Amino acid sequence: MGMACGVLAPAGRVVAADAKSLNIVFVNPGKTGEVYWDMVAQTMQAAGRKLDAHVEVLTSERNYRTMQELGFGVVARPDKPDFLILSNEESAAVPILEAAEAAGVKTLLLSNTLIGEDAARLGPPRQTLKTWLGDITTDLQTAGARMANALISAARAEKWQSPDGKIHILGIGGDEITPASIARNAGLQLAVAAAPDVVVDRMLFANWTQSEAEQVTANYLSWAARKEIRPAGIWAGNDPMALGALRAATAAGLMPGRNIQVVGLNWSEDALREIRAGRLLLTDGGHFLLGGWSIILLRDYADGCDFAATSPRVEAKTSAITRDNLAAVGDLIKTRAFDRIDFARFRARAGRCGQYDFSVDALISSLTLPEGTAD
């Protein structure tokens, strides 16, 4: 596994004056207006502006067939891009990777890599598919566990046990097939397996949406009331689902933050607002920055500092935002002023290719002051 926290160059590496301008295409698996994927694309384009790379974004509107058609269209272009960035959402990227291999287009997988039979058949990057350069993902299993442990700690501190002496939690996952979802859900199960006083009453799936999460939460809460179970916490695999859970809990007469806790993931502005209000315990994340980090990997690769010198698989850590550290990154997310990030600072140093520090602390230290702010 590649390093996402190596040695950070004090000033990074600027793009050489004679370096080739890069053309990069990103096939966005999300919907227009879907906060997480919009932010991934925006950080890509902000990094591209700093690193002499033009980033074209094509949006598949959460339809894997559209995603494949867009990918096939890119690799069939007479004027091919230098790099094509894909996400293996719904495990649908393999046909595009294979078409890119045949066309000689270099690819990078972001957020979701190959799993199961695909991984077994194709092996690691650069083996069967020579033009598949690698992947950049986040350690979402640890994120899922951290979210669950925060719920458990809060419930224990408040003594929110049910009459059976157990802490009862609802789990809401996005889906059962996307690698990033599987990892988050596994983190929840790991944390609960280590906590004999905790029970996950239900693991329900809400297709990543607020409306479906609101419905499944309402159903769970009415079931819990009938069974005389005291619900202590709701673990949601992304922020929209956490917001749906908040709405359902409030409608059921509960007071999130006071007699039940909810956690989410995505660092979305709506979630930060709920944290500030004391209704949401935390949002894990920062993984939308994979967009910017992916451009750094490809710029370094193009300039002869191949990240595969460490590993073709780069893994970045996520972090939780709570009321304690909200001020440090809240403004960046609210304004989406990603041009404040000095992406050149994160480039690998010569002789240390593939070693990156993509931590939240490094991010905070790289930020320039907002325009109009005095020194």
Where are these regions (language model features)?
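Hinge/cleft segment of the Venus flytrap/periplasmic-binding protein
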Residues: K20, K166-H168, I172-G173, W293-D375
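Hydrophobic alpha-helical segments within soluble ligand-binding/sensing domains
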Residues: M67, L133-K166, A213, W267, ...
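Short, solvent-exposed amphipathic alpha-helices that sit
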Residues: V35-K50, A143-M147, P179-V198, V216, ...
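Short beta-strand elements in bilobed, periplasmic/extracellular small-molecule ligand-binding domains
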Residues: R49-E61, G171, A193-N207, G257
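Beta-alpha junction/loop-to-helix N-cap segments that form part of ligand/metal-binding clefts
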Residues: E61-A119, M241-A242
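Extracytoplasmic "Venus flytrap"
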Residues: S21-T43, A47-G48, E56-L70, L86-S91, ...
